[in-house]
């Protein structure tokens, strides 16, 4: 692929994480859980300020959804995901993509990097062993 600026291909293991969907549901309204929860309480204020500073997003969302509703949504969703975690007050949720084609083994660098600020949902992981309904 052509990139700007040009860059050499990255020939190392890669892990892809999927964020929780808006509303914490699939497009068919099925509730979802994360495989991995990250404690965001220590950085929530910083995330809120960064989101508020995104001028074009702020303008469009204020007009389309109401004054600062997206900031309230950030707080509400972080609290809901925190509740789902059973451990954190405020959290983000992530699910790891199947490693085949991206890395030689089933690696989890986010968990390794964050240590105790990250928790794997054992129930979610166990459910992965069951056939898809």
What are these regions (language model features)?
Residues 1-133:
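Metal-dependent de-N-acetylase/amidase catalytic core
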């Amino acid at each position: 692929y052509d990139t700007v600026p040009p860059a050499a291909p990255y020939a190392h293991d890669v892990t892809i994480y999927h964020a929780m969907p808006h509303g914490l549901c699939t497009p068919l309204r099925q509730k979802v859980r994360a495989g991995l929860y990250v404690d965001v309480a220590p950085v929530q204020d910083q995330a809120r300020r960064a989101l508020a500073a995104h001028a074009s997003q702020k303008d469009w969302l204020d007009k389309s959804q109401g004054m600062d509703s997206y900031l309230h949504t950030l707080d509400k969703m972080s609290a809901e995901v925190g509740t789902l975690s059973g451990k954190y007050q405020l959290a983000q949720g992530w699910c790891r993509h199947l490693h085949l084609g991206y890395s030689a083994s089933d690696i989890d660098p986010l968990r390794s990097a964050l240590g105790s600020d990250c928790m794997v949902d054992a129930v979610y992981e166990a459910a992965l062993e069951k056939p898809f309904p």
